[in-house]
């Protein structure tokens, strides 16, 4: 649209700018044509200006363009001079670069100032289209010249261009339509907002449109209204923050993804390093001389003042188990697809055997399952698992924070962020990281050597003897119902199935290894069973663990008589040898001490009623424990089905299973069916007899059993009486109802007989207790 524009040929009275000092870059506009005290270009009546936009990128916060543009200033001048259509009526006088706005002013001298400014402007643009200006500072943009209708203000304040321009009016207000028609020629407008009769806000879709409009129209007078324009200052950080908060559906998942990427890129390599260090150097640390010396000295202080025979300790037992060691070594050199399970009761030497076998292995990872699965608190489990694998750092406190963030996001945007890290998720993350490290260790030589003929799986198959070894000590098969234990078993199964590690499971449970086959695709486990030493070997073990001066014939005879009382459990034999060496005790005193200690432990653990303040109530009662103790003090074992006929155990076996888990008893199986019940340890048999032979304890426990049986009979009678009352309320009794009533009456009589018999026993036991001093 052809606008009737008025042009100002002289400088306005701008004395209010006369004392302004540049805030930064003090010699930015060192040009003879610029009046630096007011920031305006000096123009004669027959001179005019063109503004060429987009010569360089619009400056950012650091204003790098100012320095880079100086390198190309001469080249730009040549291109601009060549593109301008100089003629007899119009000559290019000078070029004033305006780096702050990304363009330049062209000062033009006319022979006679033109009346049709639109025609002149189009003529100049056509010339620039034919000879476009190209610059490496803005290679994908074509600069366009615009005729300047106002009086541009070349300030050097620390103000950067913005797409939003504020326009202040001096004179009558203008309508939104009129402002749109004036400024649309410089580019697309997003909005035109009238703020007040003296101001408006123009929002352009591009930055080049805003810079062109401001440099061409500042100081322009439309009718009687003069424009004063400035960029609206935009705090980009605040704007970005506002945008983030106003688009939570986008930003919250983006933040979650950023956290995930940061964790993966920053912390995962650190964690892998610590896990690898634990696997590679954990075994070596136990073999360091200083550590070994401290362990040896500590053990010797406890075991014996005699050090010269330390190397002979445990020699007899390992002579007989040499075949077991060779078998384990052979399995560890093979490419197995199943677990290696070492079974044996606690104290049978499973860990010592495995330590001897893996002593020369480079990469060994050890888990103490007793400590790992002893807690029901998942956070404690995660912490223990991280400690045993070497996983560090562990940010367990972030679980609660991420849960709160997820809840807040669901309430705010209606969907979850996906950043919640549960304890189960952390467990899997720890195990996955450990698995990755084990795989890299298993394939390390494959990467270092020229093994192009073998792929990774073939390499692992061929070099199975170099695979890392994972040891799960005290892994209880009967507790596979524990979800965390199942997760660890599944992870161990993956190690075996992928062939990246050998997995040894040391378990005190006898039998039950079939349950592990589900984790290795049904492959049968390699099982090694360790038992107690026979009497001859047990005697040799104790004898050869003593100094030579103590190995007398009298001692051998005494051991031959006394050792059968405690059996051949390796831990108990160590205790006897320690008592003989350190305390110079007799054999009978040493054996008596270990029996008394076990009897005291049984009394405190199984024969005392549960404390009222105890958080975890045992599922067995003292009378149930005493019943088993009494039976096993008289017999080597109890048939499981016979035990279930006892009134205290009849109808449920929870108590028996609980006593097995507490290691008071051991249950053997036949075809997955409970078969026989044995004492938990050989020494327990002697301890049971000692407890049963205590007249006061025996009488008190029999009283407890009698009272328990009376209570059970009373409850049964009460239930039968209630049913009889219901039958009586029916009125006329049919024959079937009469039979039921007769049955209930018979049961009541039978239970009453039980009560009578037990009350007589109570009287007898009470009288017996009175006679004991």
Swiss-Prot record:
Residues 163-234 form the RRM domain. GO terms for cellular component: cytoplasm; mitochondrial inner membrane. CDD domains: RRM_Yme2p_like. The keyword Iron-sulfur does not apply. GO terms for molecular function: RNA binding. Keywords: Membrane, Mitochondrion, Mitochondrion inner membrane, Transit peptide, Transmembrane, Transmembrane helix. It is found in: Mitochondrion inner membrane. Residues 271-773 are mitochondrial intermembrane. InterPro entries: Mt_escape_2_C (IPR018850), Nucleotide-bd_a/b_plait_sf (IPR012677), P-loop_NTPase (IPR027417), RBD_domain_sf (IPR035979), RRM_dom (IPR000504), Yme2_C (IPR039627), Yme2_RRM (IPR034260). Pfam families: RNA12, RRM_1. The keyword Ribonucleoprotein does not apply. Residues 1-29 form a transit peptide. The chain crosses the membrane at residues 250-270. Its main location: mitochondrion. It is a single-pass membrane protein. Disulfide bonds: none annotated. Coiled coil: none annotated. One of its GO terms (biological process) is mitochondrial genome maintenance. Residues 30-249 are mitochondrial matrix. Plays a role in maintaining the mitochondrial genome and in controlling the mtDNA escape. Involved in the regulation of mtDNA nucleotide structure and number. May have a dispensable role in early maturation of pre-rRNA. Belongs to the YME2 family. This is Mitochondrial escape protein 2. It comes from Schizosaccharomyces pombe (strain 972 / ATCC 24843) (Fission yeast). The gene is yme2.
